[in-house]
């Protein structure tokens, strides 16, 4: 009965949803493209071979989280096709940049019975893996009716989401019974799922697969090549995955730092592509000498900022930097993954708003493997300056964070072990 009301409400809201997509397309015209896929219509698109793996990652962050899993699945099960779905154009671009034609990519339809029915008929998977937090009752129900396992991998549940689901806890039990496995990334999320009524015998704490980063030889070669072209013996700090309200703070800090370190270079990488031009306009307004990564222009001695407006190159940007600030943390967005810069033993600075990754930041703070600052330009400037002035501090901070990364590896293998029965079953 609850799913009936949920579906009815979703149908009633379709005009509002379409208006919302229209508003999004004003800032990012890509939202207007492939609209039919949102309703399970695929036209002349090639359909994947049946009995493959269907993986859903809502946007860029989830795609990044899924990357080591997909790479390993491609290696271990090369005979199984992989269908990758996202919701956002940025997620779509990240899939294409990372995997090219080695996976099939579509937008996941809205969670309407007829749309989901068409999608499942089109893909015909043997297993559905959803990354991190996505719960779609009609998708789960229709997969269950077809005996297709539904797994939430690297699952996390924020306090806010747990509170919202808690209001309808009594109505969740049928949906919980249709989910084959939840592999939680930390104890906090695991306890929240259990509190909401998910059966403990189907709940596993595997750890966060984001710890299983791989800085492969190809990436290291690209880093060496770009470092030769860009660094020119200049110190570089990166402000990565920044959100609205953070760039102004970062640029004010950088302006003050340039007065003391005239050859300091900032790599400024906004989280979302639709903000690339907005940040470029801000750089012009603030009269910084900058270049855009997308133009392949090389920095000269006058370049103060490089705007990272390319897709799929964040690890490359981290690799050539000396100090990293991880964004989404000076504003109440919840922060982003600090493990990527730590893979290079790089000192990491973050704001105080890191509630998206409570377990990771708790461990890093305990071992002094991250430097937390208040949401002011002065605080950020002092943190960067302290690290620029002390190689010992940079190494101590970077090494402490790197040890946390290494000690927590293995989540990917634990997840793969849990997935193996579903992947190898005969249908």
UniProtKB/Swiss-Prot annotation:
Q: Which family does it belong to?
A: Belongs to the glycosyltransferase group 1 family. Glycosyltransferase 30 subfamily.
Entries under NCBIfam families matching the protein? PRK05749.1-4
Active site: residue positions: 62 (proton acceptor)
**Where found?**
Cell inner membrane
EC assignment: the record states 2.4.99.12
Q: What's the gene?
A: waaA
Q: Where is this site: Transition state stabilizer?
A: 132, 210
Keyword Membrane annotated: yes
A GO BP term here is: lipid A biosynthetic process
Q: What is this protein called?
A: 3-deoxy-D-manno-octulosonic acid transferase
Q: Which SUPFAM superfamilies would you find in this protein's record?
A: UDP-Glycosyltransferase/glycogen phosphorylase (SSF53756)
Supply the source organism for this entry: Haemophilus influenzae (strain ATCC 51907 / DSM 11121 / KW20 / Rd)
Is the keyword Transferase assigned to this protein?
Answer: yes
- Which reaction(s) are listed as its catalytic activity? lipid IVA (E. coli) + CMP-3-deoxy-beta-D-manno-octulosonate = alpha-Kdo-(2->6)-lipid IVA (E. coli) + CMP + H(+)
According to the record, the segments passing through the membrane are: 4-24
Membrane topology term reads: Single-pass membrane protein
Q: Which domain of life is it from?
A: Bacteria
Tell me the leader sequence span: none
The pathway it acts in is: Bacterial outer membrane biogenesis; LPS core biosynthesis
């Amino acid at each position: 009965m609850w799913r009936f009301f949920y579906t009815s409400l979703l149908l009633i809201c379709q005009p509002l949803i379409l208006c919302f997509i229209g508003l999004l397309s004003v800032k990012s015209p890509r939202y207007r493209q492939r609209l039919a896929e949102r309703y399970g219509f695929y036209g002349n698109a090639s359909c994947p071979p049946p009995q493959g793996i269907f993986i859903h990652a809502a946007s860029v962050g989830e795609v990044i989280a899924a990357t080591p899993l997909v790479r390993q699945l491609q290696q271990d099960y090369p005979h199984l096709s992989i269908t990758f779905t996202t919701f956002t154009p940025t997620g779509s671009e990240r899939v294409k940049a990372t995997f090219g034609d080695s996976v099939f990519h579509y937008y996941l339809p809205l969670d309407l019975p007829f749309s989901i029915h068409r999608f499942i008929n089109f893909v015909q998977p043997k297993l559905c893996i959803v990354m991190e937090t996505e719960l779609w009752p009609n998708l789960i129900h229709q997969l269950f009716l077809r005996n297709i396992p539904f797994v939430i991998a690297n699952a996390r549940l924020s306090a806010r989401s747990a509170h919202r689901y808690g209001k309808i806890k009594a109505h969740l039990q049928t949906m919980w019974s249709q989910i084959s496995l939840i592999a939680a990334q930390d104890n906090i999320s695991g306890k929240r799922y259990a509190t909401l009524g998910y059966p403990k015998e189907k709940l596993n704490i595997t750890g966060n697969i984001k710890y299983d980063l791989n800085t492969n030889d190809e990436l290291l070669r690209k880093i060496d090549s770009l470092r030769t072209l860009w660094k020119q013996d200049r110190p570089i700090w990166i402000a990565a995955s920044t959100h609205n309200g953070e760039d102004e703070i970062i640029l004010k800090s950088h302006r003050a730092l340039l007065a003391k370190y005239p050859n300091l270079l900032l790599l400024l990488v906004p989280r979302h592509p639709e903000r690339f031009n907005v940040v470029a306009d801000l750089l012009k307004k603030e009269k910084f000498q900058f270049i855009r990564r997308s133009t392949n222009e090389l920095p000269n001695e006058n370049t103060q900022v490089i705007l990272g407006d390319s897709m799929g190159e964040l690890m490359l940007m981290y690799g050539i930097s000396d100090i990293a600030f991880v964004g989404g943390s000076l504003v109440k967005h919840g922060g982003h993954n600090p493990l990527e810069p730590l893979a290079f033993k790089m000192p990491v600075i973050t704001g105080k708003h890191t509630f998206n990754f409570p377990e990771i930041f708790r461990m890093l703070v305990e071992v002094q493997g991250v430097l937390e600052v208040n949401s002011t330009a002065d605080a950020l400037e002092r943190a960067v300056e302290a690290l620029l002035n002390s190689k010992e501090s940079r190494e101590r901070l970077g090494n402490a964070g790197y040890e946390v990364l290494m000690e927590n590896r293995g989540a990917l293998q634990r997840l793969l072990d849990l997935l193996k029965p579903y992947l190898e079953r005969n249908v």
